[in-house]
Amino acid sequence: YRKYHAPMGRLVYIGSAPKGAEKSAELAMNGMKAICGALKVGGKAGDAYAAWREVAASAGLADYERHHCGYMVGIGFSPSWTGGSMVTSLFPGSERTLEQGMVFHAHSWFTDTDVVDYFISNTVILTKDGAEVLTATTPENLVVK
């Protein structure tokens, strides 16, 4: 809308979901909750990644890593907010201080593991009270059949 972006993503299976998809969906949802729980005013961007990694490790995926679990979004002009070194990401060890009003595309993404692939993402805004999901469909509404 007027160059503002609020991305959201869900992995959708066509037909029947593979065996284990429900467990993978729960893992991804727990990862999203951990990311949102770690986004706090005055905190560090790397804290969100660490919280997501802890969920992965607790599920037996101690060696599973991604380059980040979210990135800042908002108004976008070419080239875009989807890449480049100027984009603030929720990456391992990031010392970027989080501020009220920052908006992130947070994602909990598990692919190419010994569990079934699953992915969810939401746009969240950092408020004085923590992360608030802005996208209309929350992870709790997912149904795996």
Describe the predicted segments one by one.
Residues 1-145:
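Active-site neighborhoods and metal-handling regions in enzymes and metal-associated proteins
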